[in-house]
Amino acid sequence: LEKYPKLRFPGFDEPYMECRIGDIYSERSQRGADDMELLSVTLNDGVMPRSEIEGKDNSSEDKSNYKVVCKGDMVYNSMRMWQGANGVSDYDGIVSPAYTVLMPNKEIDNRYFASLFKTPNLINEFRKYSQGLTSDTWNLKYPQIRSIRLYIPSLQEQHKISVFISTLEERIGIQRQLVDSLKKYKRGLLSHLFSEKSTQRCTTKRYYFSEIAQ
């Protein structure tokens, strides 16, 4: 939220532009139809088809009040925006009335703003602008979020930052897969080492704890 951030990529030195979220996004208020794909927003994975999160559709049969989502829209959980529950949709579909759907007013890098909206400074702003007595009832609708001020870089710098973050996320994903593979290997190894057949073949020697601890 600084006009002159301390950490920037080489070649970018222009001051960030001050604006309101309402200058960047408008609310999409179009209502959907029952045959459109039902979407949901998760904290870690952003916008996902509900069928990939829950095997069974437990939503209301009457979806006439559900909101339309188009590819490229920013969608957030109105009651969990202060936790960073938002994402850019790669799908056309509908979401429950508990969500707010934002569509860009101008050309922006939407992925940049999805990451920006998860930063501690913005999370704190979302918390301050949310309405409700306790965290269980906090609610952040478009009339409140559009008033929040922030500083944003040029489109070129937005894209540079967005690509950098995406690259980091890809590398993190690869490392997680590696860790999962190592854990699986460890479980298999331990299962083999301590199986009944393995222990029967092993010769054992008794040690006292004081000997091991030396």
Predicted regions, residues:
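Non-catalytic DNA-recognition/assembly elements of restriction-modification systems
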Residues: 7-33, 147, 203-214
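Sequence-specific dsDNA recognition surfaces
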Residues: 22-71, 211
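Short beta-strand/turn micro-motifs at beta-sheet edges
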Residues: 87, 133-138, 195-196
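Extended intrinsically disordered, low-complexity coil regions enriched in Ser, Thr, Gly, Ala
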Residues: 172-187, 199-200
